[in-house]
Design a protein with these regions (language model features):
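Key DNA-contact positions within bacterial/archaeal DNA-binding proteins
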Residues: 20
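P-loop NTP-binding core
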Residues: 2-14, 24-330
Length: 330
């Protein structure tokens, strides 16, 4: 991701400045570009490190907060969960928050979406959870300052079996994350579409659960299973999630079946379904193929706009937990 560049207009937008204010900051020397100039006719561009330096110089760093653990999970695959979670995490970091992404899927798709080849990783979460390797030795940097990653690869495929005989096996991930409290503002966990001990760990560690779904009726089956699982954790292990956010992904309002499915979700899950949908957008796939989040690929795309709107809605809801008992039976 280190090749990502910001135009003056985009840098100003990310920093919450007008283009004129940005120009004035440049004149004062508060903002500088480290990107080599291509000549006097080439427009100024900035690297992600320039963005980080400018944010610090202009005192536009958001207040630090206690670690917020946010899990992206759906037992049904093919919902675009990883594209959403990686772009969400990138945008948080772009806004100046300290973010740790934890790739729980042995396929390593979240790692790839952030420009990291999981196959090359010397350590994964397996080492931290099973071998009790210090978590700071497992974390790797991405190209975005403030956005770090615990990568994943095929070594994670046996983690459920390795967890089975361990004491307090449901709490291993929560204990690992205690090691990074104070270092990060957000931990974004991207989980595989399955239920096992690793995902149980993820649920037990999470404050917030994000459930990306498609606007089709197959999504209801996966949601029912997931909500039953979460309710079981409340009853058996006394773990209550602060929030559950269902977000409709790849939505196409021109499809009758999509509109009907959305209406059904609104009926059965009114307290959990986000009002903002993520519209169908081919830029997600194109960005993933290049190993960058959608904000870096095309910040003006429908997908980027919708992820930002989801983030804004979520920030507005955090602080007012909605309990699972509010769900109407589907």
């Amino acid at each position: 991701m280190e090749q990502i560049r910001y135009s003056s207009r985009r840098l100003a937008e990310v920093l919450g400045l007008s283009v004129r204010e940005l120009a004035e900051a440049e004149e004062r020397g508060a903002i500088q570009s480290t990107v080599p100039s291509g000549g006097p006719t080439q427009k100024m561009s900035y690297s992600m490190r320039d963005l980080s330096s400018a944010r610090a110089a202009l005192n536009r760093v958001p207040p630090r907060r206690p670690l917020r653990r946010q899990l992206f999970l759906n037992f049904k695959g093919g919902t675009g969960k990883t594209s959403v979670s990686s772009s969400y995490a990138f945008r948080l970091a772009e806004m100046g928050h300290r973010v740790l992404v934890i790739d729980l899927d042995s396929q390593g798709h979240a790692s790839k979406c952030l420009g990291v080849c999981g196959e090359d990783a010397e350590r994964t979460l397996f080492d931290a959870i099973i071998k009790k390797t210090p978590v700071e030795t497992v974390i790797v940097k991405t190209g975005m300052p403030g956005l770090d990653l615990i990568p994943s690869n095929l070594t994670m495929s046996t983690i459920d079996l390795s967890l089975m005989p361990l004491a307090a096996r449901e709490f291993r991930l929560r204990n690992v994350l205690k090691e990074v409290e104070g270092t990060y503002d957000y931990a974004v966990l991207d989980a595989p579409p399955s239920f096992g001990l690793l995902n149980l760990n993820a649920l037990m560690a999470a404050h917030d659960l994000f459930v990306p779904v498609l606007a089709d009726f197959l999504s209801f089956h996966g949601l029912k299973l997931l909500f039953e699982t979460v309710q079981g954790l409340e009853e058996d292990l006394q773990h209550v999630l602060d929030h559950i956010f269902i977000v409709i992904n790849a939505y196409n309002a021109t499809y009758k079946i999509a509109k009907e499915a959305k209406e059904a979700l609104e009926k059965h899950y009114p307290d959990f379904l986000l009002k903002q949908v993520i519209r169908q957008c081919t830029k997600f796939a194109q960005a993933s193929s290049e190993g960058i989040p959608i904000f870096a690929y095309d910040s003006e795309s429908k997908g980027a706009q919708d992820i930002q709107a989801v983030l804004d809605e979520v920030q507005g809801r955090i602080g007012a937990p909605v309990r699972l008992k509010a769900v109407e039976s589907a």
